[in-house]
A protein has these predicted regions:
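Short hydrophobic/aromatic beta-strand micro-patches
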Residues: 46-48
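Short, conserved active-site loops that position catalytic residues or coordinate cofactors/metal ions
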Residues: 41-43
Length: 104
Protein backbone atom coordinates (compact mmCIF):
# COMPACT_ATOMS: atom_id res chain seq x y z
CA UNK A 1 0.00 0.00 0.00
CA UNK A 2 1.38 3.41 -0.87
CA UNK A 3 1.31 6.42 1.45
CA UNK A 4 -1.72 8.04 -0.20
CA UNK A 5 -3.76 4.84 0.18
CA UNK A 6 -2.64 4.46 3.80
CA UNK A 7 -3.70 8.01 4.62
CA UNK A 8 -7.08 7.46 2.96
CA UNK A 9 -7.60 4.20 4.87
CA UNK A 10 -6.62 5.86 8.16
CA UNK A 11 -8.89 8.84 7.49
CA UNK A 12 -11.85 6.55 6.70
CA UNK A 13 -11.15 4.59 9.86
CA UNK A 14 -11.03 7.74 12.01
CA UNK A 15 -14.31 8.89 10.46
CA UNK A 16 -15.92 5.58 11.47
CA UNK A 17 -14.48 5.76 14.97
CA UNK A 18 -15.77 9.32 15.39
CA UNK A 19 -19.32 8.06 14.84
CA UNK A 20 -19.04 6.00 18.02
CA UNK A 21 -16.59 7.92 20.21
CA UNK A 22 -15.92 11.56 20.97
CA UNK A 23 -12.45 12.19 19.57
CA UNK A 24 -10.11 15.01 20.52
CA UNK A 25 -7.44 14.27 17.90
CA UNK A 26 -6.10 11.54 15.62
CA UNK A 27 -2.65 11.09 14.10
CA UNK A 28 -0.80 8.82 11.70
CA UNK A 29 2.65 8.02 13.05
CA UNK A 30 5.32 5.39 12.58
CA UNK A 31 6.63 4.20 9.25
CA UNK A 32 4.04 5.94 7.06
CA UNK A 33 4.67 9.28 8.77
CA UNK A 34 8.45 8.81 8.50
CA UNK A 35 8.32 7.62 4.88
CA UNK A 36 10.13 4.36 5.65
CA UNK A 37 7.16 2.03 5.15
CA UNK A 38 7.06 -1.24 3.21
CA UNK A 39 4.16 -2.94 1.45
CA UNK A 40 3.45 -4.99 4.60
CA UNK A 41 3.82 -2.12 7.10
CA UNK A 42 1.00 -1.49 9.53
CA UNK A 43 -0.68 1.92 9.66
CA UNK A 44 -0.19 3.30 13.16
CA UNK A 45 -3.06 5.58 14.17
CA UNK A 46 -3.14 7.40 17.51
CA UNK A 47 -6.74 7.95 18.61
CA UNK A 48 -7.13 10.59 21.33
CA UNK A 49 -10.49 10.12 23.04
CA UNK A 50 -12.54 12.24 25.41
CA UNK A 51 -14.34 10.80 28.46
CA UNK A 52 -13.02 7.23 28.27
CA UNK A 53 -12.90 5.34 31.59
CA UNK A 54 -11.53 1.99 30.34
CA UNK A 55 -8.86 2.03 27.63
CA UNK A 56 -8.67 -1.76 27.41
CA UNK A 57 -12.32 -2.07 26.37
CA UNK A 58 -11.86 0.76 23.89
CA UNK A 59 -8.75 -0.90 22.43
CA UNK A 60 -10.68 -4.11 21.79
CA UNK A 61 -13.55 -2.18 20.23
CA UNK A 62 -11.18 -0.15 18.04
CA UNK A 63 -9.72 -3.39 16.69
CA UNK A 64 -13.22 -4.60 15.81
CA UNK A 65 -14.13 -1.31 14.15
CA UNK A 66 -11.29 -1.70 11.69
CA UNK A 67 -12.87 -4.77 10.10
CA UNK A 68 -14.69 -2.44 7.72
CA UNK A 69 -11.41 -0.74 6.89
CA UNK A 70 -7.95 -2.02 6.13
CA UNK A 71 -6.71 -4.60 8.63
CA UNK A 72 -3.25 -3.04 8.45
CA UNK A 73 -4.54 -0.23 10.68
CA UNK A 74 -3.09 -0.47 14.18
CA UNK A 75 -5.09 1.76 16.54
CA UNK A 76 -3.41 3.22 19.62
CA UNK A 77 -5.97 4.81 21.98
CA UNK A 78 -5.14 7.58 24.45
CA UNK A 79 -7.23 9.51 26.93
CA UNK A 80 -7.15 13.20 26.06
CA UNK A 81 -6.01 13.94 29.62
CA UNK A 82 -2.98 11.64 29.18
CA UNK A 83 -1.96 12.82 25.71
CA UNK A 84 0.81 15.32 26.44
CA UNK A 85 4.46 15.92 25.60
CA UNK A 86 5.60 14.65 29.01
CA UNK A 87 5.07 11.12 27.67
CA UNK A 88 7.96 10.16 25.33
CA UNK A 89 5.64 8.06 23.12
CA UNK A 90 3.20 10.97 22.74
CA UNK A 91 6.10 13.34 22.07
CA UNK A 92 7.28 11.07 19.23
CA UNK A 93 3.76 11.00 17.74
CA UNK A 94 3.52 14.79 17.88
CA UNK A 95 6.99 15.32 16.40
CA UNK A 96 7.02 12.70 13.64
CA UNK A 97 3.32 12.11 12.98
CA UNK A 98 0.68 14.20 11.31
CA UNK A 99 -2.86 14.96 12.33
CA UNK A 100 -5.93 13.53 10.62
CA UNK A 101 -9.18 15.45 10.29
CA UNK A 102 -12.03 14.44 12.58
CA UNK A 103 -15.50 14.40 11.05
CA UNK A 104 -17.94 16.60 12.92
Amino acid sequence: MDKREAIMAAQNYVNNVSKKYELAQAFIFGSYAKNNYRADSDIDVAIVLKNIPNLFDVQVDLLHLRKDEDLQIEPHPFRDTDFNRDDPFVNEILQAGFELKIAV
